[in-house]
Structures are given as C-alpha cells and as structure tokens.
Amino acid sequence: MKYFSILFLLIISYSCQQKKESKIISLTSNQAIKKFEEKLSDAAISIIDPTIEYDPAYFSIPYPNGDVPKNKGVCTDVIIRSYRKLGIDLQKEIHEDMVANFSAYPNLEKWGMTKTDPNIDHRRVPNLEVFFERKGQKLAISQDPSAYKTGEIVTWMINGKLPHIGIVTNKKSKDGKRNLIVHNVGRGQVLEDCLFDYEIVGHYKYVK
C-alpha cells in the first residue's frame, strides 16, 4: 500500500510539472509573437518620411535584398522596408514561393506575366495578399476598429480600382478608438488615421 501511495504521488507530481512546463512554453510563444508585432510596428514608424516620392515605375533592382531608390516608393515598399528592418526579405520569400507556385498568384492581364520577376513581383499588392494568406494568417474583415491589432497588415481598394496596403501600428487615433496606419498613398511614407478611409478588402498577420 505504501508503495502505491508513493507511486501515485510521483505521477501527480510529474503531471503537474508537465502542465507547468507546457504553460511556460505557451506563454513564451505568445510573448515572442507579441514582441515581433511590436517590432514590426516600430519598424514601420521608423521609416516614416513624407518626402518619399510616390513612383510606381518599374525598377531593375538587386536580388536578394533589393530596393528601389531610397527617395522613391509606393505602398508596397512600406511593407517591404518595414519587414526588412527585421531581417525579413519579402522580395526573396515571395519570389521563391512564386517560382514554386506560380499558378497560385494572380496573373492580371495588364501585367502580361509568363514567369516570375524579382524586380516587381513583391511590389504588387495582389501578390502580397496571396503570399500573406499562404504563408501567414488571413484574418476577418470587420468594421470594429479593435479587430485590427498592432503589427497586422490591411489592404484596401481605393475608388474600386487601386489596390492599397499598410501596416497597423501601436499608435492610437486622437479619440483612442483606432490604431494608426503607416502607408504611402501619394503623400510619402506617413502615419495616419486612415483605417476606414477606404474599402478594406484584406486583413492579414505575418509573423516570424
């Protein structure tokens, strides 16, 4: 009887320890995700520059880690430059995924694409949307501002024809209801209260 009592206590002790370790691992994982999202917000805020010239022209750029001229850019360059601050090269990641899964990506008629192009593929909003859905997490679209968290990605369709993209930051609007967005819609890389200024068509999270 004494033997079984000792064995029972050992089993209970081991079970409690396992639960404790699992809880610690879970907390550590959540903290890592939160830390990344905050870092992405900080990275986006760090590249704010209203003097950036909005230029959608095609540029031949290095690969990997290529970028258009520093004084130029469009909305997608905000995303690319922010992630690159964290050591993540979306040019390379998107190119590699497109090479392996070209048919999964949109091939809009105006692009006339028959193969991948690392100069421009990652700078197109529809390609970013597909990549974030494939490799990250597609989130619900909502009219509730609290649904859009720090470090998440939002895409819009402006006037029914212009795809747009931005990063949700940890900064709040004056009324405290909405997170501010870093984006570039023609006024440079800026931080604005614009979450619901355009039609939201995509909501994503991509953490590493």
Where are these regions (language model features)?
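...with weaker cross-activation on analogous glycine-rich loops/strands in unrelated enzymes
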Residues: 36-41, 99-181
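Acidic helix-start/capping segments at beta-turn-to-alpha-helix junctions
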Residues: 55-76, 89-113
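Bacterial signal peptide processing site
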Residues: 17-19
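Sec-exported extracytoplasmic/periplasmic mature domains
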Residues: 45, 49, 80-88, 95, ...
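C-terminal motif of bacterial Sec signal peptides marking the signal peptidase cleavage site
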Residues: 12-15
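Second-shell loop/turn segments in exported
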Residues: 26-34, 61-70, 114-118, 139-142, ...
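Low-complexity, Gly/Ser/Thr/Pro-rich intrinsically disordered linker/tail segments
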Residues: 176-208
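Sec-dependent signal peptide recognition
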Residues: 2-7
